[in-house]
């Protein structure tokens, strides 16, 4: 992000999305927000009350007629003077309004995430809440929305702040024992009690990290891979799951050469299903590449659906992979073996067994995700810093042969790592990465 550290500029951007639209919302934030009202020949409206006005250029020409809202500092999203202009969502209208604002001294178009970054800088939110807002905007399923809302509501911040305060309090006891060991009002040897408290905290953080694996699955989605020999019905199954023709279906073996992926919403959980090249020996260079990609995707899968044509001879061979594998018998309408090898029998021609398979996929996804707690680490950044926190706590607990001064320093570092998650300490180098994930206007 360019030079915005001082926040002397007043920023503006279209916040309401793609044009044309019924209504377009332009957001403004910064010290010259009041000057903007003066420039468009309008009085500043009563705070947080919608006012109808005519938006004008600097020479007095009418641009549009619409609503405006004014939010004076510090009681605004960014903590600065803010305004919203609600105009008709025509492209020419919005472009003219943005051009007028861009001509004003000290005003410029906002960069991606800059409104939220200013809110963070002004203490209106911490980094976990900002990340939760980014996830809320990106959420495509109900489960993702719920998870993002939990984070954006401040549940993570509350938990991490509590843990950090416990570390600070424990460190204070140790330093009190160091500095005032001869004073009568300092309990004798409180350190044993402190180590017990730290051990309990360590176990809490470990449990918290474990819950983050499920949250990551919900945020990033589960991955299901369809494999099998050529003409086993893989593409037909993918088309059924997608509800449209995604893959080409042909009697010619080896039609699918590359990976084809569709995204499903199963009970609010995002599930990515990938169709792969048929697994067989081949002299085709292109087909070999497709088969290698299929094997690579299998290695990353949460679930593998191994398909085999039931109308032919039973010859189930499943490659050794870590993911759970379901054996699916296809083309059930053509008869053939009713072998107990198959977990499910399906026919994309008659629809037999397909709804049962879809229900099973949803049940699998729900079991994988489980019950998401109120506060969970949703990003790898959180987990890395939580693990660093545990490492410092372990050093403090296990350092029986070390001076108390060094063990107190381990506790200080542990609290610092927790502070980095919320942005309370030393996070300048990651701010650009976090806020660049937002769209312009947020």
UniProtKB/Swiss-Prot annotation:
Residues reported in the UniProt entry to bind (6S)-5-formyl-5,6,7,8-tetrahydrofolate: 27, 84, 124, 442
Subunit: Homodimer. Heterotetramer of two MnmE and two MnmG subunits.
Gene assigned in the entry: mnmE
Record key words, sorted: Cytoplasm, GTP-binding, Hydrolase, Magnesium, Metal-binding, Nucleotide-binding, Potassium, tRNA processing
Pfam short name (any one): TrmE_N
Record domain TrmE-type G: where: 221-366
Enzyme class: hydrolase
Cofactor: how bound: Binds 1 potassium ion per subunit.
Principal cellular location given in the protein's record: cytoplasm
Positions that bind GTP: 231-236, 250-256, 275-278
Subcellular location per the Swiss-Prot or TrEMBL entry: Cytoplasm
Residues holding Mg(2+): 235, 256
GO biological process, one term: tRNA methylation
This enzyme's EC code(s): 3.6.-.-
Its job: Exhibits a very high intrinsic GTPase hydrolysis rate. Involved in the addition of a carboxymethylaminomethyl (cmnm) group at the wobble position (U34) of certain tRNAs, forming tRNA-cmnm(5)s(2)U34.
Cofactor(s) demanded: K(+)
One GO MF term: GTPase activity
Annotated GO CC locations: cytoplasm
Protein family: Belongs to the TRAFAC class TrmE-Era-EngA-EngB-Septin-like GTPase superfamily. TrmE GTPase family.
Organism annotation: Brucella ovis (strain ATCC 25840 / 63/290 / NCTC 10512)
Protein name: tRNA modification GTPase MnmE
């Amino acid at each position: 992000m360019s030079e915005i550290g001082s926040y002397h500029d007043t920023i503006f951007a279209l916040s309401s999305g793609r044009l044309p639209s019924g209504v377009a919302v332009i957001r403004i934030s910064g010290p010259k927000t009041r000057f903007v009202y003066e420039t468009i020949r309008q009085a500043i409206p009563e705070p947080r009350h919608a006012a109808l006005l005519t938006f004008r250029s600097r020479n007095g020409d009418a641009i549009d007629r619409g609503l405006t809202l004014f939010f004076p500092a510090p009681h605004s999203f960014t903590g600065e003077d803010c305004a919203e202009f609600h105009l008709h969502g025509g492209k020419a209208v919005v472009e003219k309004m943005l051009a007028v604002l861009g001509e004003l001294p000290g005003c410029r178009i906002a960069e991606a995430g800059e409104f939220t970054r200013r809110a963070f800088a002004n203490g209106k939110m911490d980094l976990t809440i900002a990340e939760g807002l980014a996830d809320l905007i990106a959420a495509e399923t109900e489960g993702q929305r719920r998870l993002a809302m939990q984070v954006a509501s401040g549940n993570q911040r509350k938990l991490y702040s509590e843990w950090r305060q416990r570390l600070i309090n424990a460190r204070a006891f140790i330093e009190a024992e160091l500095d005032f060991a001869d004073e009568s009002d300092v309990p004798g040897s409180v350190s044993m009690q402190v180590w017990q408290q730290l051990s309990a905290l360590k176990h809490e953080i470990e449990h918290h990290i474990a819950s983050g694996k499920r949250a990551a699955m919900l945020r990033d989605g589960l991955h299901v891979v369809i494999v099998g020999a050529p003409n086993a019905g893989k593409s037909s199954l993918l088309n059924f799951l997608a509800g449209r023709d995604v893959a080409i279906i042909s009697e010619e073996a080896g039609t699918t050469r590359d990976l084809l992926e569709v995204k499903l919403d199963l009970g609010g959980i995002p599930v990515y299903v990938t169709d792969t090249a048929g697994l067989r020996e081949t002299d085709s260079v292109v087909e070999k590449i497709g088969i290698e990609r299929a094997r690579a995707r299998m290695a990353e899968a949460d679930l593998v659906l191994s398909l085999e044509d039931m109308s032919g001879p039973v010859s189930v061979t499943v490659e050794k992979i870590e993911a759970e594998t379901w054996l699916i018998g296809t083309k059930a309408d053509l008869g053939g073996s009713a072998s107990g090898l198959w977990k499910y029998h399906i026919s994309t021609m008659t629809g037999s067994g397909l709804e049962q398979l879809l229900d099973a996929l949803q049940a699998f996804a729900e079991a994988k995700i489980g019950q998401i707690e109120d506060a969970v680490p949703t990003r790898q950044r959180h987990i890395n810093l939580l693990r660093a926190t545990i490492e410092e706590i372990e050093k403090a607990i296990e350092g029986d042969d070390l001076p108390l001064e060094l063990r107190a320093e381990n506790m200080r570092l542990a609290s610092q790592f927790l502070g980095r998650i919320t942005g309370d300490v030393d996070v300048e180098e990651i701010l650009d990465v976090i806020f660049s994930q937002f769209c312009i206007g947020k």
